């Protein structure tokens, strides 16, 4: 004889989520990248908008003018600490992808490859 008890499953009541209210009609101008800035109101000061990339460029030029050239080769060495085995580095200093296991030939007992 099998015991037949009451099911404990109870479906959750469905909740109705109201859609967000529309403030006004949606215009394509609102989504354009080249929208003219709105005119400032009486209480707001007038500001000039600049391209963020151009503003960043101007800041970079002023900061690097007094420092001289950046040592690029030295900064790359700091990013990759030396482990004592540089066999993975390619001729240009970038790491090479590991070889395809299907293409790798197993060395014979007499031959030994350097392993890192």
Curated annotation (Swiss-Prot):
SMART domains: GAGE (SM01379). Residues 31-44, 86-95 have a biased composition (Acidic residues). Pfam families: GAGE. Residues 1-116 are annotated as: Disordered. Residues 102-116 have a biased composition (Basic and acidic residues). InterPro entries: GAGE (IPR031320), GAGE_fam (IPR008625). Belongs to the GAGE family. This gene belongs to a multigene family expressed in a large variety of tumors whereas in normal tissues, expression is restricted to germ cells. These genes organized in clustered repeats, have a high degree of predicted sequence identity, but differ by scattered single nucleotide substitution. Their sequences contain either the antigenic peptide YYWPRPRRY or YRPRPRRY which is recognized by cytotoxic T-cells. This is G antigen 2A.
């Amino acid at each position: 004889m099998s015991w037949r008890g009451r099911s404990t499953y109870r479906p959750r009541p469905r909740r109705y989520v109201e859609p967000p209210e529309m403030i006004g009609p949606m215009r394509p101008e609102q989504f354009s990248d080249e929208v003219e800035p709105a005119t400032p109101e009486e209480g707001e000061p007038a500001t000039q908008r600049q391209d963020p990339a151009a503003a960043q460029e101007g800041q970079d030029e002023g900061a690097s003018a007094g420092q001289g050239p950046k040592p690029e080769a030295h900064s790359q060495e700091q990013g990759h600490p030396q482990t004592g085995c540089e066999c993975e580095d390619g001729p240009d200093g970038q790491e090479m992808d590991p070889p395809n296991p299907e293409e790798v030939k197993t060395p014979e007992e007499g031959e030994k490859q350097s392993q890192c």
